[in-house]
């Protein structure tokens, strides 16, 4: 099954950006939040084909891994038209935002503002890999604290 998934992702990543854009439905930030929240987003990055898999906690944390490196402070939030992730303490924080397009069962993540495909993912219901059970605990501040209706800090 993993070989099939890798083959599907490899084909999806090889499609020219214009072709994917025409066949895909761009999701609003609210639609993206509804799909991602409480679920695991798993896929591969374009360019290097390295994996990512993150469980999106309702409180703004993203536990799991990027490029096989465990998340220790990852947070996520949606804007009007994108999903944004931030990593690290305030003084050295790295922020990445992506528009999300649905093409069949695949979610195409495009870097903002360039529009380049950053990765292709699928949604796994819930937390099938148990990322939240073994994750270190952290709080999400900054972007998440200023989001409408999302002022609650991650706790546990």
Placement of each model-derived feature along the sequence:
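Lipid interaction determinants
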Residues: 18-73, 85-156
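Bacterial N-terminal signal peptides
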Residues: 8-16
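Bacterial N-terminal signal peptides that target proteins for export
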Residues: 1-8
